[in-house]
Amino acid sequence: MFIGVTGYNHESSAALVDKNGVLIDYYREESLSRIKGDKSFPKRSIKKLIESNNLKIQDIERVAFYERPLSSFLHTAKEASLHMPKSLSLLAHQFRNFNRSSVSCYLDFAKQFRGLETKLIYSDHHLSHTLTALAYSNTKKDICSVVVDGFGDRSTASISQVIDPTEINELWECPYPVSLGLFYSTITDYLGFAINEGEYKVMGLSSFGDSNSKLAKLVSGLMDWDSKSNKLISEMSYFDYHLSTSKSYSSKLEDLLGPARNPFVPLIPG
């Protein structure tokens, strides 16, 4: 039996899979802790998986974690260090909360489920996305996998060649901090909605917009594809998500698009 675990950044969960890749059981931490969006180490979910399926620690062959925590930590810290002292608050926050981040995954397993920490493996974040897509695909061979994310390990987007589930080759990646996902979250924040929560509202509101408007053209100009270098490019001076924990956009974005919406002011249809 194998256990897959996610946590610390988004809603935590744990899944039990057999040797054939068949999903046996699954729990979201929030359903057990009764804390909406619970992103803590999913100790209740793992405990429930083991107890509900009459398993012991020795019955678990491997535990897979969905990213490589140290890689993620170091890449964001490295980028922030290039912009000191402006990024001091972000760096301080990262190191201050080190023991509550995914870097502590190994220690949490050792503390809560002694023995499982020795079976822990870390999966590349974008590989995890690709493997998840494969699990729901009727086709398992000769596939092109496109992952567009906020950030994972070192990349924010990737393209991979899937020869079969055991042979996956990454062909292209977009390195942090340029990120289509974080760009979307920044616009979500600018419009007065919560990051990682209000993006669906922006998606819904976009249907009422005008893609030919001056404002739409200004927004589309913030990020582009450079066909010569095959890179996603962005003018990072408009963004602060790689520098701050409290604000994702700079004053320059407000100069370009106008004042950001106050989240406490009701939306009035125009």
Region spans (language model):
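Short acidic/glycine-rich loops and adjacent helix/strand connectors
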Residues: 1-270
